[in-house]
Structures are given as C-alpha cells and as structure tokens.
A protein has these predicted regions:
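Bacterial N-terminal signal peptides
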Residues: 1-4
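Active-site mouth of glycoside hydrolases
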Residues: 13-257, 261-267
Length: 268
C-alpha cells in the first residue's frame, strides 16, 4: 500500500521532557501530556538494517515513515549501527551523519518523534575488526565519540525524543568473557557487553562509570534532550533480581527508565 508524501503537511513538533511528577512525559510550553506510541524501525522484511539501504532507497524510508504515521504512531525507534557511523576509533562517518540529519528532517515533516538508539552491532559481520579488538577503555572512548557526533547532529531539533545509549547492555558475571556480543537472534546480535572483565569491580561500579562517560559525551553538545538506556526487566525471569542500570547509585544521570517488555498478542 502506498502512502503519498504529498498528502502530508509539515508539522512543527514541540520539545518533549519528563513531567514535573516524574511519572510521564509532556511537550510544549503548555506541558501537554505526551504518550509515546510507535514502532521499532531496525530492519526491513528481508532483514536489511536501515543503513543498508537508506542511501540508495530513500523513497522506501519516506514511504515507511508515512505509513507508520498513518497507522497512528507518534514516535519511531531508530537503531544506529556503530560500524556505519565510525570509520576509526575517533573518526565519525560524515556521510552517515548527513543522512541522519536528513532522517531527522523527514521525521519532523511527517510528524514523528525519534528515539535514537546507538552503538548497535546487530550484524556481526559488519562490526569493524578494529572495534572488536579495542580494550574496555578505548572501546568506551569510541562509544563516547559516537555519541558526541550524534548529539551534534540532533542537539537543536525537537524531533529527537531521546537518546537511548545502547540496546539492552549487559555485564559479565565473575568469569571473564571473550566476546563483546552475546547470542544471535534471527540473524542479529541485539545485545552486547559493556566490558569483558569486571577486574575486581562491582557490576554497579562498571555500569555507573560507563553511563557517566557516555552521558557526559552527549551533554558536551546537547543539554536538552532526554537520555535513557533500554533494558530487559530481569526480575520477571529471575525472581529477586535487582535493576542494575536504574539503581539509584548507577543511573542518576539518566532522565527516565526504559524497560523492554515483549507482550504476546492481546496482552498489551
């Protein structure tokens, strides 16, 4: 089904923020209630990631955005692949950043906010060898460089709803790990570790240090947009499990809690 763009009027999206009670979102000077409702937009029907085709098949992206808007969405979650946005540990890809800027303008014209989820490594074959070889400190520096570049592009646009630092990050237990990416699901690696070795530190210490470094990177260029990190509610699978990234002593610099539930049909 086609959704012609000519029928869409340019819409002025208002800035969003956490409300004064800290239990929801509002937008604009009147603090109108905002309830995010939308789609994950991470791959097409053949499994291609957005960056695989957004340069050559822009009309497809525009049509998809129009369709999502027509279906009642007000927000779209975009998954940015680190390997497409970083050419080297400290060198962002200018072409990818320009295309992200184009996407932000498309979203604004269509009337859709964006959740920009970053640092993705969903296709293992596309993860740069140099990135996989970095030790923890250097890897975090590259991740900070990534977020600085993204924040520079998005800082002045109300289209950005939030920056989601990483999709469902995890840490090792006591045993040292050897792989940054965890298991595969449907040909993709949606989850990655932020360290391979606790090295005598607690999980909370590592999580806090990582969060603070990335939040600081964003805030160097963008003091306004909300920052979060999407996590799995482990307590539903493991009774008694405690939140890590949203523990008070860990996630104090995040703006809101983002928990990923996967309901079945008719269970929303």
């Amino acid at each position: 089904m086609a959704f012609p763009l000519v029928e869409l009027s340019s819409q002025s999206l208002e800035w969003t923020r956490v409300n004064s009670k800290g239990d929801g979102f509002v937008r604009g000077p009147r603090s109108d209630t905002f309830r995010a409702w939308g789609f994950n937009y991470d791959h097409d029907e053949s499994g291609r990631l957005l960056e695989d085709y957004w340069q050559t098949e822009w009309d497809t992206v525009a049509s998809d955005f129009a369709e999502m808007k027509a279906l009642g969405a007000n927000i779209v979650r975009i998954h940015l692949q680190l390997g497409r946005f970083m050419d080297a540990p400290d060198q962002p890809n200018v072409k990818a950043l320009a295309q992200l800027n184009r996407l932000i303008h498309l979203a604004g014209k269509t009337g859709l906010y964006l959740n920009l989820t970053g640092l993705a490594c969903y296709h293992k074959k596309d993860v740069p060898a140099w990135y996989d070889e970095l030790e923890e400190a250097a890897r975090w520096e590259t991740q900070a460089c990534f977020w600085e570049a993204i924040a520079k592009v998005g800082a002045d646009s109300p289209v950005i709803f939030c920056y989601d630092l990483m999709n469902e990050p995890v840490l090792p237990r006591k045993t040292k790990e050897t792989e940054w990416l965890t298991g595969e699901l449907g040909g993709k690696h949606f989850v990655q570790r932020i360290t391979l070795d606790l090295a005598g530190r607690t999980r909370k210490q590592v999580a806090r240090a990582w969060l603070e470094q990335l939040v600081a990177a964003v805030r160097r260029h963008d003091q306004r947009h909300m920052i979060t990190v999407g996590v799995i509610p482990w307590a539903l699978s493991f009774p008694g499990a405690k939140p890590l990234f949203y523990a008070p002593e860990v996630g104090g610099k995040l703006d809101f809690v983002s928990v990923h539930f996967y309901p079945k049909t008719d269970e929303i």
